[in-house]
Amino acid sequence: MTKQLTLFDIPSSKPAKSEQNTQQSQQSAPVEEKKVVRREWLEEAQENKIYFLLQVDYDGKKGKAVCKLFDKETQKIYALYDNTGHKPYFLVDLEPDKVGKIPKIVRDPSFDHIETVSKIDPYTWNKFKLTKIVVRDPLAVRRLRNDVPKAYEAHIKYFNNYMYDIGLIPGMPYVVKNGKLESVYLSLDEKDVEEIKKAFADSDEMTRQMAVDWLPIFETEIPKIKRVAIDIEVYTPVKGRIPDSQKAEFPIISIALAGSDGLKKVLVLNRNDVNEGSVKLDGISVERFNTEYELLGRFFDILLEYPIVLTFNGDDFDLPYIYFRALKLGYFPEEIPIDVAGKDEAKYLAGLHIDLYKFFFNKAVRNYAFEGKYNEYNLDAVAKALLGTSKVKVDTLISFLDVEKLIEYNFRDAEITLQLTTFNNDLTMKLIVLFSRISRLGIEELTRTEISTWVKNLYYWEHRKRNWLIPLKEEILAKSSNIRTSALIKGKGYKGAVVIDPPAGIFFNITVLDFASLYPSIIRTWNLSYETVDIQQCKKPYEVKDETGEVLHIVCMDRPGITAVITGLLRDFRVKIYKKKAKNPNNSEEQKLLYDVVQRAMKVFINATYGVFGAETFPLYAPAVAESVTALGRYVITSTVKKAREEGLTVLYGDTDSLFLLNPPKNSLENIIKWVKTTFNLDLEVDKTYKFVAFSGLKKNYFGVYQDGKVDIKGMLVKKRNTPEFVKKVFNEVKELMISINSPNDVKEIKRKIVDVVKGSYEKLKNKGYNLDELAFKVMLSKPLDAYKKNTPQHVKAALQLRPFGVNVLPRDIIYYVKVRSKDGVKPVQLAKVTEIDAEKYLEALRSTFEQILRAFGVSWDEIAATMSIDSFFSYPSKGNS
């Protein structure tokens, strides 16, 4: 796994320990000639056995789709190749004879045949004919789709297309019958059906039937899957050099394996250039090898005992490095259970490979499944946030560690990687399986893609189930591009949410009312979908009005829209069924934990729905739908604020889907909640209650303290991960002071103490009292250094300064830099001195953070500056409030 750059990642002035000693320990691969034939890494699935479908791939050598099936009894993955004759294809709106006259198509080596198919128009529900062009190779679809005026369903990966046509749902159980998969979903009892009918009583028939069809997805057992986490350490001759996984020029000195079955093993290369060391290894089994060739052979043998391999950044580093290193040592490709032919993906041929880095990097997973608990995406940061543990700290290059320290360091990384899937009763693995079921994506693709791909795949699957034609993006835009409002935010095509400006000050006894999943609820309630808004023929039109009463669009209520149905389905399942089941005392603890996982999985999809459908890059993006959602949101919020004020409630602040009320009477709260339900059929609920909230007067910017002393910080810069540590430390002092406020009588004294803390920080900054680590900004490199052409951000400028010293930085490395008085204005911490620090730039960091809090106390930054006699540092005008 690649390592985060630290203060130690700079070449030493003394000669590095000789690489020669390590290289001399490597023996060449056996010289006898080997005859290697293609190996089938997976056994074939057996007739009449039940398996869980985990992944569908395309085997290019056999020219078939292959289903990867997990047997929970043997804990192995088996292969089932398609025997239906299914082939890649795409659709065109041309007569078959016209297609037959296109030479590039019919003379293509992969062309198979043409047939006529019947599809349903999602806008009218009428049937019509299309021509299906069938080929023998998925790559031919990509090639031939450009030879027709319009190619439908030609941008879908073949293995996903296969799942749509066969109706497969990854993560679900199937039995093999005559070489085909037949579902063995659990049967519903009368109690289940009655619960569904009750929960979806106000829904249309399509939604009720879908609810019955979907219930097994959430209720079917999630199998425990044996898995092993691996991590490799590679010898490097100088500090700061990150090994290139494609060149694989340096030896692998150790490989750690941590298994869900209790395996704790490290394979170590014997070397004569390091000491043995004396570290307590806590039951870790160590195997030593004289040659790297033998070490890798043993590693492959162990790997084959597991159906799933876990890594953290294994797509980019661990697995490619192992593969190319094995080739260098004399292994044939057929002997290596790894394939790196795919773009940005490494496959484990004897099972599945899950790169947890990519899964945890998914913003929807971070924000909704794990409630934003981590802000950085490296292994150490994620582990600290979710597990409360961290990597082993070392103060020298990995290559120079004593053997036992290397073992401890290496194994901890593998152990943490495994624990990220086992904590909270296998929470992560259960989420992955449930996400796979909901999205209809195979586990490997799901863990490597963003939420937009998940949602797109679900909708495509549902289109195919209904035999609906999946429309082209340009066709949707042609029918739904009429935008009536102007965006207030640059880059947005239409007006967004309404925000009620907050006053500056500290207010006690604040209750927050929240519209439960407002945008998804609006989509469901108003039947919003690309095929229902602004369509030409409609018997039951409904006007979409904004907060001013202007009619923006017309929604057709003749038929349920697919977006409204699926969004409403997931929302109602979560709110009406699974949130309740997760808290039901009649359920066992194990059941409650499972139901909590189910509702978390639903939350990810529900909360991501509007963001995905409101993104111009999404293939089903309809501007009129996105504009309708935000317009109705503004209408609902402004109407509710008006009603609340009529009830005598004081609305201090409102943002998108929530209202902050000052000390509201209980009966008034109940009245407004009932009114919203009656008027809009939306759920308004008490979300939280604060002891007090400090508003800066800015939108999306406040500091709230709950009755139990916990805090809720929104919009303040200190929450950003690149905020220097010294600012965070000062902020924590201020935070503790804020928490101590219990009544309005405390405010004056706490204000004085906060001002003193901020002044003290300035004095320490002025006197060079902070070290470089405390002053460092931390920013992740998102792409190779050479890819920054037009603009060069500060962290890139700092990274470029490391090049002359032999330090190679790669995408996803964290760059630590400080602001200095120089042409570039920055330096990497490895090259900087405290005396070079530009104090004025750090004063700006202090100001931007604490000016917001001070505003709530009625203190402007100018007052702070004046009392410290530092006006000369601030040539720009004050932005603070008096």
Swiss-Prot record:
The keyword Coiled coil does not apply. InterPro entries: DNA-dir_DNA_pol_B, DNA-dir_DNA_pol_B_CS, DNA-dir_DNA_pol_B_exonuc, DNA-dir_DNA_pol_B_multi_dom, DNA/RNA_pol_sf, DNA_pol_palm_dom_sf, DNA_pol_type-B, RNaseH-like_sf. Its EC number is 2.7.7.7. DNA synthesis is stimulated by PCNA heterotrimers. Keywords: DNA replication, DNA-binding, DNA-directed DNA polymerase, Exonuclease, Hydrolase, Nuclease, Nucleotidyltransferase, Transferase. Residues 1-31 are annotated as: Disordered. Residues 18-29 have a biased composition (Polar residues). GO terms for molecular function: DNA binding; DNA-directed DNA polymerase activity; exonuclease activity; nucleotide binding. It comes from the Archaea. Coiled coil: none annotated. One of its GO terms (biological process) is DNA-templated DNA replication. Pfam families: DNA_pol_B, DNA_pol_B_exo1. PROSITE patterns: DNA_POLYMERASE_B. Gene3D superfamilies: 1.10.287.1390, DNA Polymerase, chain B, domain 1 (3.30.342.10), Helix hairpin bin (1.10.287.690), Palm domain of DNA polymerase (3.90.1600.10), Ribonuclease H-like superfamily/Ribonuclease H (3.30.420.10). It catalyses: DNA(n) + a 2'-deoxyribonucleoside 5'-triphosphate = DNA(n+1) + diphosphate. The keyword Iron does not apply. This polymerase possesses two enzymatic activities: DNA synthesis (polymerase) and an exonucleolytic activity that degrades single-stranded DNA in the 3'- to 5'-direction. DNA polymerase I, DNA ligase and the flap endonuclease may be constitutively associated with the PCNA heterotrimer forming a scanning complex able to couple DNA synthesis and Okazaki fragment maturation. Interacts with PCNA subunit PCNA2 and weakly with PCNA3. Belongs to the DNA polymerase type-B family. This is DNA polymerase 1.
